[in-house]
A protein has these predicted regions:
Chain B
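Signature of N-terminal electron-transfer/Fe-S-associated modules in redox systems
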Residues: 1-153
Length: 777, 153
């Protein structure tokens, strides 16, 4: 198959004098297991990098320096809108002592870049900025270049310095040689050396600086190419026809119903997948609307009103995260036992632009432009959907609308592939708003029970957490296209759901933040949690979902944190303790303690118990609340203070101020980090105040922006202040999901502080707030 | 045949008169500014300016704007010579994925042209029908305010 390179990649390779394929094939690289950023993917899907991926342990897989000195870096972590491309470019420039704009970064193209599984789960920093992969490949390359320069100039490497791609003798500026001259357009042919010395943060001049994103200018002037803008010669347009109800199947399709419409090329049916291809998108839409499809009745849906009770009663696959085995006994000995149930609805990614992909399937070969978060997984699963060999599928990432997790990106890619295969021409598909919203893989609904025992001094002596959450499908991974709607309609099954009792926890894993921050987390004897409560149990029940589910920014972590941090606040209020002081009393991780203290300081936190003394029970009341988390148990420390105003007559909640403190290890780009903290905080606010998937007895009813309630751009936006704790000596962690994880909890705690009413169900709609106010003691 | 005047150029296109303007702009003229977000006039991603008004091109039939001067995001400025709004968005790094930016800037442009010195509240009000799902609100609203001051000079 002829690899289709984008212009930038092609010109870089042309300058370097070889094709990328040839380049890697002839590298003589020994393929051994190497961590390409597989932490989450391995846990979820097993296995390792895909066949055909440039080997992660080879410098040449990550870096090419042409004879003219131009530097091209290759990454398996893509730009989804969070600035990760910019910071990867900064990283390469820093390690190689180059100006930022001398580095060209190419990411996520199965003909060019290493397989780093999904770009997801706040894993791009851990994957590429610590002691492996892109960062370490650059460090290895730097050492190799210094060695070559030392030989060439006859000067010991420690008496050389590098700047602007030139290595110069420290004592004699006239003795110098450029990277391009040293390599002469050849490969490195080097294994990544995990011991190669990284540039210390104290010497950084590019990394750690607020370098502006190069994609901003094309974005704001309408020059940027989204996947929506990909146009291929002879390209046609497709529209899909989704079932009218959950579980409905195709009985018959009357193709004659659209045969006279202008521009219609073909009606495509594959099992329950139905679509139309036309010359132009407007014609495709007309045809999709008019196509007569007879569907079987839907399967019927559980009542929305009683859904949380329904969820509790379903057969479950259990996951025991920690169990000290003495929780019931200690609760029996406690002076006081408190209980509460927290509820979180299904929420959607609700991407601003509905998902889009362009596929060109010709015979047994396919070239696909996709906004997928995992090009290599799309390659193998699209091959399954098309019934062709994965080797014959070339997937090229093109940015879609911000996804925040598994939106319609993968499913629409299968849509485009199936329709293109049926007509043998390139086909572009963009979903309708309704098709995006009614069938995406929603963020999980959660029911969470919390129970804790306090001693006579008000200390927590035992805590039990139990949750129920429904699941159906997921990311497709390397072999499950049926995990999203199109794959399923076309005849593939989603991951099987089998109830099973919990096994004993085998190690400490708080990837879902199911374990509260206050637990000692003693699995197998050694405490690995961030807290002090030794009598502890955390148990999750996974049950079957009637709707598709998948990761939505801070999946399960946000829901669990809402319950844990709200409940901690309830305990503090019960013993009339200050919420910050009470947290600190039960925490032992120094970095988590540090973010809590720093955020309290920055927010001018007033030390006192909640509710706020002197607040009246009518009119407007103000209050403050806080929440903290070690995201995923090891991936970023964050604490957030929310200040709110509650209109007790209307039930309207207004956030006035958020103060966030983040410790994500070394800060790659402070401005980019602030952008993520701000965006996460406001997205969290929208999710806490309004967002909820709704349905009737047959179908989803939240299908547009009138029925799914997001905050608009213009509203009474709270002030957001971010405090960044830079820790260059620590490992880099993710930062895209920290602030969002804390908002619902901090907001609920602030509402309690303002009013004395506890909100335990998301979203905090005015009706729910008024009901909670009416129920106050 | 439909004649459209876009960013100072005239185009004659063979289109069903009911075709929404957005389809003509993004598919026939291959413009990258206006975008399909919802097709329902609810999110703003498709916004263009016609006769000084920010309109939702996804629900505007081409026939209804035939002959009128249509300005898209591309028509405001270029990478080399950005409009003050575009410049402010770059300076404030006021975007994440960038999909909504068209609707935000075009809506703000039409608003600022009529209200040269708006208050923070007036800007919020003017932008209350536009969505950004990455929630870059703080920076975007700040950039609009700064651009407004620049444009009023």
């Amino acid at each position: 198959m002829k690899p289709v390179l984008n212009c930038d990649a092609r010109s870089a390779l042309h300058r370097a004098g070889f094709s990328r394929r040839t380049f890697l094939k002839t590298s003589g690289a020994l393929i051994v297991t190497f961590n390409a950023g597989w932490k989450n993917a391995e846990a979820q899907f097993g296995g390792g990098p895909s066949a055909g991926s440039p080997p992660a342990n080879q410098v040449d897989s990550w870096l090419a320096i042409a004879a003219d000195g131009s530097v091209t870096a290759y990454s398996g972590k893509e730009e989804l809108g969070q600035g990760i491309a910019t910071v990867q470019q900064q990283l390469v420039a820093e390690e190689l002592s180059l100006p930022f704009d001398r580095v060209k970064l190419i990411y996520c193209d199965t003909a060019l870049t290493p397989d780093q599984a999904y770009t997801s789960g706040s894993q791009s920093h851990p994957a590429n900025f610590n002691r492996n992969n892109l960062a370490q490949a650059c460090a290895t390359a730097r050492e190799a270049l210094f060695k070559l320069a030392s030989e060439r100039l006859g000067i010991p490497a420690d008496q050389l310095s590098a700047a602007n791609g030139v290595i110069t003798a420290k004592s004699n500026a006239s003795k110098k040689v450029s990277y391009g001259e040293l390599l002469g357009g050849k490969k490195f042919t080097l294994t990544v050396n995990t011991a190669a010395k990284r540039k210390p943060a104290s010497e950084w001049t590019v990394l750690g600086k607020p370098i502006p994103r190069p994609d901003l200018a094309p974005l704001v002037t309408g020059r940027f190419e989204f996947v929506h803008n990909v146009r291929l010669p002879g390209m046609l347009h497709g529209k899909v026809v989704r079932p009218p109800a959950v579980g409905a199947t195709v009985m018959s399709v009357d193709e004659s119903s659209v045969k006279d419409l202008p521009g219609v090329v073909k009606v495509v049916v594959k099992k329950n997948f139905v679509g139309v291809v036309a010359q132009k998108p407007w014609q495709a839409l007309q045809a999709a609307n008019k196509l007569k499809v007879t569907w079987s009745p839907g399967a019927g849906l559980p009542s929305h009103a009683d859904f949380y009770e329904h969820v509790r009663k379903q057969p479950a696959r259990d996951n025991l995260m920690v169990d000290s085995k003495d929780v019931e006994q200690k609760l029996g000995e406690a002076t006081t036992v408190l209980k509460a149930t927290y509820l979180h609805p299904y929420q959607m990614h609700g991407s601003m632009g509905s998902s889009c992909a362009v596929a060109d399937v010709q015979g047994d070969r396919a070239t696909i432009y996709s906004p997928t978060q995992g090009v290599w997984y799309q390659k193998t699963t699209a091959a399954m959907v098309l019934g062709i060999k994965p080797d014959n599928v070339h997937v090229i990432f093109r940015r879609g609308s911000g996804c925040y997790g598994l939106n319609g990106a993968d499913t629409v890619t299968y849509d485009a592939a199936l329709l293109s295969q049926a007509v043998g021409k390139p086909v572009r598909v963009q979903l309708s708003r309704k098709d995006e919203m009614a069938w995406e893989n929603y963020g999980n609904a959660f029911v969470m029970d919390e129970r804790a025992g306090l001693d006579a001094q008000g200390n927590i002596i035992a805590w039990d957490h139990e949750s129920w959450s429904p699941t159906l499908g997921n990311r497709p991974g390397p072999r499950t296209p049926g995990n999203v709607i199109t794959g399923y309609l076309a005849g593939f099954e989603p991951d099987a759901f089998a109830p099973r009792p919990a096994a004993e926890p085998r190690g400490y894993n708080n990837g879902s933040n199911g374990i509260p921050s206050y637990f000692a987390g003693a699995v197998g004897g050694t405490p690995r949690g961030t807290g002090t409560v030794k009598s502890e149990r955390a148990l999750a029940h996974i049950v079957a979902s009637p709707f598709w589910t998948g990761p939505l920014r801070s999946p399960a972590r946000l829901q669990n944190t809402f319950a844990h941090e709200g409940f901690l606040d309830e305990l503090a209020a019960h013993v009339k303790a200050d919420p910050v002081a009470y947290r600190l009393r039960h925490l032992r991780d120094p970095r988590l303690i540090a973010v809590v203290k720093e955020v309290a300081k920055a927010a001018n936190w007033e030390t006192r118990p909640s509710p706020r003394p002197g607040n009246r029970k009518t009119g407007t009341a103000i209050g403050r609340g806080m929440a903290c988390v070690l995201y995923e148990g090891d991936n970023g420390y964050s604490a957030l203070v929310a200040e709110v105003e509650v209109d007790q007559d209307t039930g309207k909640v207004s956030a006035k101020r958020f103060v966030v403190c983040n410790d994500v290890g070394p800060v790659s780009n402070p401005n980019g980090l602030r952008n993520q903290i701000e965006g996460g905080a406001l997205q969290g606010l929208s999710r806490a105040l309004g967002e909820e998937v709704t349905w009737d007895d047959q179908k989803v009813t939240s299908i547009d922006w009138r029925t799914y309630h997001t905050l608009p751009l213009g509203f009474d936006v709270p002030k957001i202040e971010a405090v960044l704790l830079d820790r260059p000596e620590e490992e880099a962690t993710g930062a895209g999901e920290t602030s969002i994880t804390l908002v619902a909890a901090a907001l609920g705690n602030a509402i309690f502080d303002a009013t004395g009413a506890r909100l335990r169900q998301i979203p905090f709609t005015p009706e729910r707030v008024k009901a909670a106010l009416a129920a106050r003691a | 045949m439909i004649t459209l005047k876009v960013n100072g150029r005239t185009h004659t296109l063979d289109l069903d008169p009911a075709t929404p303007l957005l389809y003509a702009l993004s598919d026939d003229l291959e413009l990258r500014g206006p975008k399909f977000g919802c097709g329902l006039g609810q999110c703003g991603a498709c916004t263009v300016i016609v006769k000084g008004q920010a309109i939702r091109s996804c629900i505007t039939p081409v026939k209804s704007v035939e002959g009128a001067e249509i300005t898209t995001l591309e028509g405001l400025g270029t990478i080399e010579k950005p409009h003050p709004l575009q410049k402010a968005f770059i300076e404030d790094q006021a975007a994440q994925c960038g999909f909504c930016v068209n609707g935000v800037i075009m809506t703000a442009k039409a608003f600022l042209d009529k209200n040269p010195k708006p208050s923070e509240q007036e800007i919020q009000q003017a932008m209350s029908g536009v969505l950004c799902r990455c929630f870059t609100n703080v920076r975007m609203l700040r950039a609009i305010q700064r651009a407004g001051q620049e444009m009023a000079r």
